[in-house]
C-alpha cells in the first residue's frame, strides 16, 4: 500500500470514528426525547432479537410513561401477534388504526393478523387498503434489510399474498390451499 492511500484511509477512519462518537453523544445526551422513547428503543431491540415477552414489557413501560406513544402502541401489537395472543393483538391494532387511520403499515399488520386467524376476506381487504395508502409496501423489504436479516431471497409481499388468497378463494373449497403453516409463520410484520 502506498503512503498516500494509507494516509487517506487513516484519516477517513479517524473522521468516521469522530463522527460516530459525536452523533452518539448528541443522540444520547443533547437531543430531546419524548417520554417513553428509551423504553421503546429497548423494546425494539428485544423484538429484533425475537424476545417478544421482554419487548412487550418494554412497550408497555413506554405506554405507561406516554399512553399516546404511537410507535410503542404499534410495537405492542406486533409483539402480541408474534406471541400468538391474537385477541389482544386485534384490540391493539384497532386502537392503532383509530389513532393513525392513514398509515398503510397499520392495515398491513392487521391483515397479517386476519390471515393467521383464517379470516381471509378481511385480510385481503386490509392488504388492499394498506397498498392503496402506501404502494411501496408491495416492494417488500429493501435489500439492505434483507441482508441484515440474512434473508437472501425476496419474500412474498402483502400484494402477492392478497393475489394468492383471491385466487385460492375463487377455487372450490376442497381445492383451496390457504394455509401452509411453516411458510405462513415466516411472514414478518411491518415496522415504520
What are these regions (language model features)?
Residues 48, 60-64, 94-98, 129-132:
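Conserved structural position within tetratricopeptide repeats
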